[in-house]
UniProtKB/Swiss-Prot annotation:
Has phosphatase activity toward PtdIns(4,5)P2 and PtdIns(3,4,5)P3. Required for the patterning of procambium and during the differentiation of vascular tissues. Acts before the acquisition of preprocambial identity. Seems to be also involved in the abscisic acid (ABA) signaling pathway. Acts redundantly with CVL1 for maintaining vascular continuity. Regulates phosphoinositide-dependent VAN3 localization. The lineage of its organism: Eukaryota, Viridiplantae, Streptophyta, Embryophyta, Tracheophyta. Residues 254-290 have a biased composition (Basic and acidic residues). This is Type IV inositol polyphosphate 5-phosphatase 6. It is an enzyme of class 3 (hydrolase). Broadly expressed in emerging organs. Mostly localized in procambium of growing organs. Restricted to vascular differentiating cells of young organs.
Length: 617
């Protein structure tokens, strides 16, 4: 009996290794998620949702199929005219982060508060990791080590479901010291030294405070130092209007200089029939929606404004429009100058999906009240490592449907190397990931979307260690880093160069970068690793390896930030997005009487969190 069991185990192990080595996919990709019935406490292993109907044993003729399709379309058109759908468009906040942890397993007391609690609680957390295990032969060719992944899940769960300072640690740690956090990008870097003696300014928070949260007993996050940028600064989901008469200097700012009067936000757009994406194109417009739900925060006019003392770069491809010396805010601020406290939502978060492929690890968390609206979870993995298909490099893609809007989150670790031509290998990785990522089609309601590849989704966010380097020598790049000349560095950034040439990520967006390169640092240090090496030894040129990009309408980036943890030789990078999500409701008209066709007044007003449309198709 024991011999038979042993043979069975060996056979199962052999099959698993063959599948791993040759990247043979099972019919459904398994992933880990919380059991919905256990309120996010227990974890279960699930398979990608696939509701393909069994093929019929009787094959219909082509004429019968066409006739049936025509009848269904005619019936659907008639129903759409008789019963128009009410489409609610709501705004949800998404926290997206990527971190290469250099093969280090997290200690149980690792503090993630400064990372995950650096902003107002988001509706969705998308956290991607690379190298959660060492990329040695044992982990690449052998059985998968999921021990570190479980540790990360435990730490994330504890951090998200606890207020800052109560996650079992001594609260917020002092962030790593950063010399001269901001630079005047529009100055002449060869002769400008104004920023060298400037002090760090307490940047304003984009969180929405309320006067009801003045309780000093509520633990609050400490002010953090981060290099940050907002592609289009939104506060409470409205573009922040700026005062044209305001003129500020980069050397001294008062908190009051960045505050707005409540009357400045009394304006509302007169045409609410436009989508929020229409308003986002115009900085002067206001958008009638709040950053968070009414249940989470009380409405209050924003105190944040963007000063008008900024200049547009002539080279928009480098993403250097607004100078960081004038766009000042901090997602880590705990209160504004009026003393308003920032509450931390006590609602629980649950794990909806997590997947590991060797060192790549992607995990998605949502607020518990959203869990029932998340459907059609599907996972697809593409290996691009050894021999072109092993999982030490590659991607994990997770597809999901939130209400009626499809999302795809792609976590990648691309080919490394800083030799000339290595960027072409990374381009090839991206193309192969887009080509080979496939999701099983779901056949359920006709109204539910079931994308089968990445670009078919409504909203796509791509994160990870993309490994694109800066095409300069170590000495030249280091000199520009010390000058904080991000523009010159970005002009030599391989990703920007390849994207501008149309070789990769054509049509994709990335936020403006105003933080130093995130790779490669000496262990537990703020020094780049090349500083500790002999000049004749091989040095890693500082580079922005860790990136977040997005594709599709209805996504607005609120911030693009780097963290300062010394845990790895990479610095974590995260962005906060506002995502438009559609939810459709069918209103059945039984009669044409006045009472049946009456529209409530509330439906004509803009929602505090979105807006409403009528759709006949």
């Amino acid at each position: 009996m024991r011999e038979e069991k042993s043979k069975t185990n060996k056979l199962a192990w052999s099959k698993k290794m063959v599948r791993k080595w040759f990247n043979i996919k099972s019919k459904t990709e398994e992933f880990q998620a919380d059991d919905p019935s256990s309120a996010g406490i227990e974890v279960e292993h699930r398979s990608s949702f696939s509701a393909e109907k069994a093929p019929s044993t009787i094959k219909n003729t082509k004429t019968e199929k066409l006739s049936k399709n025509w009848e269904q379309q005619a019936r659907q058109r008639r129903m759409n005219y008789e019963n128009p759908r009410i489409i609610d468009v709501q705004n949800y906040s998404i926290f997206v982060a990527t971190w290469n942890v250099a093969g280090r397993s997290p200690p149980s007391d690792l503090n993630l508060d400064e990372w995950l609690h650096s902003s107002a609680p988001a509706d969705i957390y998308v956290l991607g990791f690379q190298e959660i295990v060492p990329l040695n032969a044992g982990n690449v060719l052998g059985a998968e080590d999921n021990g570190p992944a479980q540790k990360w899940l435990s730490l994330i769960r504890k951090t998200l479901n606890n207020r800052p300072g109560t996650s079992g640690t001594s609260g917020y740690h002092t962030p790593s010291p950063i010399p001269v956090p901001m630079a005047e990008l529009d100055a002449d870097f060869s002769g400008s030294t104004r920023q060298k003696n400037s002090t760090f300014f307490h940047r304003r928070s984009f969180q929405t405070p309320s006067s009801t949260w003045n309780d000093p007993s509520i633990p609050q996050p400490g002010l953090d130092r981060r290099f940050s940028v907002c592609d289009r600064v939104f506060f409470s989901h409205r573009p922040s209007d700026f005062d044209p008469s305001f003129r500020g200097s980069s050397s001294s700012h008062r908190p009051s200089d960045y505050s707005r009067r409540p009357s400045d936000y009394s304006r509302r757009p007169s045409d609410y029939s436009r989508r929020p994406s229409d308003y986002s194109r115009r900085p002067s417009d206001s958008r009638p929606s709040d950053y968070s739900r009414p249940s989470d925060y009380y409405s209050r006019p924003s105190d944040y404004s963007r000063p008008s003392d900024f200049s547009r770069s002539s080279d928009d491809d480098n993403g250097l429009g607004d100078s960081p010396s004038t766009v000042l805010y901090s997602p880590g601020s705990a209160a504004n100058e009026n003393g308003y406290r920032i509450p931390w939502n006590s609602s629980q978060y649950c794990l909806v999906a997590s997947k590991q492929m060797v060192g790549v690890f992607l995990t998605i968390w949502v607020k518990s009240e959203l869990r029932e609206h998340v459907k059609n979870m599907k996972v697809s993995c593409v290996g691009r490592g050894l021999m072109g298909y092993l999982g030490n490099k590659g991607s994990i893609s997770i597809s999901m449907l939130l209400h009626q809007t499809s999302f795809c989150f792609v976590c990648t670790h691309l080919t490394s190397g800083q030799k000339e031509g290595d960027e072409l290998k990374r381009n090839s990785d991206v193309m192969e990931i887009l080509k080979k990522t496939r999701f099983p089609r779901v056949k359920s309601s006709e109204e539910e979307k079931s994308p089968e590849n990445i670009l078919q989704h409504d909203r796509v966010i791509w994160l990870g260690d993309l490994n694109y380097r800066i095409a300069l020598s170590y000495r030249s790049a280091k000199a520009l880093v010390e000058m904080q000349n991000w523009r010159a560095l970005l002009e030599n950034d391989q990703l920007r160069i390849e994207q501008k040439r149309g070789h990769v990520f054509k049509g994709w967006n990335e936020g403006k970068i105003y933080f130093p390169p995130t790779y490669k640092y000496s262990r537990n240090s703020d020094r780049y690793s090349g500083d500790d090496l002999h000049p004749k030894e091989k040095r890693r040129t500082p580079a922005w390896c860790d990136r977040i990009l997005w594709f599709g309408e209805g996504l607005h980036q609120l911030s693009y930030v780097r963290g300062e943890s010394r845990f790895s030789d990479h610095r974590p990078v995260y962005g906060i997005f506002c995502a438009e999500v559609e939810s459709a409701h069918n209103r059945i008209k039984r009669t044409t009487s006045y009472s049946a066709s009456r529209v409530q007044a509330e439906e004509l007003l803009p929602y505090s969190r979105g807006y409403t449309e009528l759709s006949f198709f």
